Amino acid sequence: MIVLEDIEVMARIGLLEEELYAPQDLTVSVEIEHSFDRISETDDLADGIDYREVIEFIREFCGAYDGKTIERLADLLCKSIKEKFPSERVHLVLNMPRYVNKLGLSAIRVEVEH
């Protein structure tokens, strides 16, 4: 399993006009269940998943997103990662830190799996 934690991204997301005015800071963590059998034999990145490509894909996807809810963003992103990087399972956690202090919470996040 590949685990990438707390990837910093920007996305235009929210319900309030002030939220949609400028992109918000979010973090994405993703677990990609993928067989290491082939890459373990060959030691060739072409037989595995390049972490840098995953990170770049996540940042570009979020940067292009323009929507209202983090639930939809998380679901679409998770599905897109699974399609682009063939895997048995993708588990994604999307954190929205903007209102954590204002609401007296330790975290605001959604988790989705495909």
Feature roles, as predicted:
Residues 1-114:
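N-terminal, polar/charged subdomain of small-to-medium soluble alpha/beta proteins
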